[in-house]
Structures are given as C-alpha cells and as structure tokens.
Amino acid sequence: MVDLTRSLFAPRRGDRPTVAVLGLGRFGSGVALELMESDCHVLGVDADPGAVQALNGRLTHVVRADSTAEEAMRQLSVHEMDHVVVAIGGDLADSILTVSLMRRFGTHQLWAKANDDRHGEILRQLGVEHVVHPERDMGRRVAHLVSTSFQDFVEVEPGLAMVRAT
C-alpha cells in the first residue's frame, strides 16, 4: 500500500502550513474550510461518514477514521502536521483521548475545543496550549457588540481585547 499522505502532508520548509482538523462537526468544518481559504493544506478526520462526505473535495484530504486510534493517526501522518485542531464536541472521552494521543505524539501547536469550563480545565491540564470555548467566546463578543457602539470586538485574553469603534 502506498502512503500518499506522507507526500501530501509532510511539512516542508517554505511550503504552506499543514493542519489536521480532528472532528468535522459545525466547529471543525468551519475551521477546516477557513484554513483552506487561508491557503493551508488541511487534513480533515471524522468517524462519521456523513461529515466526511460533506467535505469531500473541499479540503486537501478528508478521511473517515477514529482520532483516538494511534495507528490510524500515524498512517495519516498527523504526528507530522504543523498544527492540530481537536474539534470534537460531542464525546468528551474521545476529545480527551485524542488530545492525550496528540500530546504523546509531541504535537507543538495543539488547539482544542472545550464544551464547558470543566472540559477546558482538563484540556489545559493535559497541556493544550490553545483551548477554545466557541459558544462562550461568541456569546461574550455578541454581548459587547449589543451593549456598546463597537462595530467589532475580539477578546485576545482576559482583560485584553481588540475593538473597532464607530
């Protein structure tokens, strides 16, 4: 069997960034499609055949696989990606197991979606550098836009935000 993923996704100096998005629900597919627009090589992985089919032909490569399975992730060269986004929201155990596997791989640029504060705390304890709370963060953003004259509001970190005022 020929391993095409190695030639497609192995990071190369001066080449476009390689990103694996593990979990292709609403959040993961949004991230993956935006990364494609940003000229990244994107490998999308999900266990749901419907999610994979929906993105077929829209990402550099999209595969049906279990992101908690070490051998499957190695065959897809996920351990060689520049960035990995764990976008699994529906199954807390799968999210944690996938993050744990990525940490064992030594993934340096690891992003993970948290469903709630407890999930986020577990992800931070596992060493995730970038924990994303999409619902909470968007709720805060909308609240600031509704209650002020800001045209846009992006919280960079607690106590620090970028705003565009009218």
List the predicted regions and their residue ranges:
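Cytosolic regulatory regions of ion transport systems
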Residues: M1-T166
